[in-house]
């Protein structure tokens, strides 16, 4: 799959990543290579192969759910760059 500089520009804009114009063409080539590799992976016959989430089959110990106070808001927000009324304040990301 071929990716061009215009597609990279559009994806970068959607992801809010500022990329200089001179980097768009090298990024397009790199992304095209990655997508070609993924297409090769899609050609591998995986019929009959069980899906797995880890290479080691283990089970984690279960614990009882316990209700807690949730912590001291002052301690929780101590390292927050910005807080208001016991909440984290973050920049708006949806227009």
Swiss-Prot record:
Signal peptide: none annotated. It comes from the Bacteria. It catalyses: L-glutamyl-tRNA(Gln) + L-glutamine + ATP + H2O = L-glutaminyl-tRNA(Gln) + L-glutamate + ADP + phosphate + H(+); L-aspartyl-tRNA(Asn) + L-glutamine + ATP + H2O = L-asparaginyl-tRNA(Asn) + L-glutamate + ADP + phosphate + 2 H(+). Its EC number is 6.3.5.-. Keywords: ATP-binding, Ligase, Nucleotide-binding, Protein biosynthesis. GO terms for molecular function: asparaginyl-tRNA synthase (glutamine-hydrolyzing) activity; ATP binding; glutaminyl-tRNA synthase (glutamine-hydrolyzing) activity. One of its GO terms (biological process) is regulation of translational fidelity. Disulfide bonds: none annotated. Heterotrimer of A, B and C subunits. NCBIfam families: gatC (TIGR00135). Allows the formation of correctly charged Asn-tRNA(Asn) or Gln-tRNA(Gln) through the transamidation of misacylated Asp-tRNA(Asn) or Glu-tRNA(Gln) in organisms which lack either or both of asparaginyl-tRNA or glutaminyl-tRNA synthetases. The reaction takes place in the presence of glutamine and ATP through an activated phospho-Asp-tRNA(Asn) or phospho-Glu-tRNA(Gln). Belongs to the GatC family. This is Aspartyl/glutamyl-tRNA(Asn/Gln) amidotransferase subunit C. The gene is gatC.
């Amino acid at each position: 799959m071929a990716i061009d500089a215009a597609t990279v520009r559009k994806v970068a804009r959607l992801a809010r990543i500022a990329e200089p114009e001179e980097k768009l063409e090298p990024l397009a080539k790199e992304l095209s290579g990655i997508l070609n590799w993924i297409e090769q992976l899609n050609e591998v016959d995986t019929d009959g192969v069980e899906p797995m989430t880890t290479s080691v089959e283990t089970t984690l110990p279960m614990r009882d759910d316990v209700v807690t106070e949730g912590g001291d808001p002052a301690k929780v927000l101590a390292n927050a760059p910005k807080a208001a009324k016991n909440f984290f304040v973050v920049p708006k990301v949806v227009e």
